Amino acid sequence: VPPGFTPFRQS
């Protein structure tokens, strides 16, 4: 997954 990506939030 890309840095800073979570399945819960993307900012």
Swiss-Prot record:
Tissue: Expressed by the skin glands.
GO cellular component assignments: extracellular region
Keyword terms of this UniProt record: Amphibian defense peptide, G-protein coupled receptor impairing toxin, Hydroxylation, Secreted, Toxin, Vasoactive, Vasodilator
Biological process, per Gene Ontology: defense response; vasodilation
InterPro entries in alphabetical order: Bradykinin
Assigned protein family: Belongs to the bradykinin-related peptide family.
Protein name in UniProt: [Val1,Hyp2,Thr6]-bradykinyl-Gln,Ser
